[in-house]
């Protein structure tokens, strides 16, 4: 319901890159990030997706023009059941819907693939998540199984 009256614009700067990953889990990761971009933005949402090769892997960035995340909240948003303060009060008195599980799931999936996820944001301006996924040639010993 939160998304029904929003105008969403996507720009993609996606290069075709090969990564060793589970496409179903990665699909859920990007669904979650894009859904959050829409949920925590005004009525006119602009989302940019970038992908590019870096040393020993690939970076994928998802950036929006949403409400932003404070520096303090950036420290906790990947923890289970934690939500950014601004997200709780964005829509009506009850805030935007959510349980604080989505970004914890994103982190879990990316780390299980041997990667990393980070956030850069400025309140009232933007949020940008960067995901690093390692090259297929890197060793996968010790990686966690996704449950």
How would you label these PLM feature ranges?
Residues 69-86, 144-145:
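Short conserved segment of the HATPase_c
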């Amino acid at each position: 319901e939160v998304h029904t009256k929003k105008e969403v614009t996507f720009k993609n700067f996606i290069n075709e890159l090969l990564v060793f990953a589970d496409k179903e889990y990665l699909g859920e990761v990007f669904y979650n990030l894009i859904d959050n971009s829409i949920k925590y933005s005004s009525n006119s949402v602009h989302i940019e997706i970038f992908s590019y090769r870096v040393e020993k892997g690939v970076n994928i960035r998802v950036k929006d023009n949403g409400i932003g995340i404070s520096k303090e909240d950036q420290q906790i948003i990947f923890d289970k059941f934690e939500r950014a303060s601004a997200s709780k009060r964005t829509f009506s008195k009850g805030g935007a819907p959510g349980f604080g599980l989505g970004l914890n799931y994103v982190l879990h999936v990316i780390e299980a693939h041997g990667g990393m996820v980070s956030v850069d944001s400025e309140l009232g301006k933007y949020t940008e998540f960067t995901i690093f996924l390692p090259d297929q040639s890197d060793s996968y010993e010790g990686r966690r199984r996704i449950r």
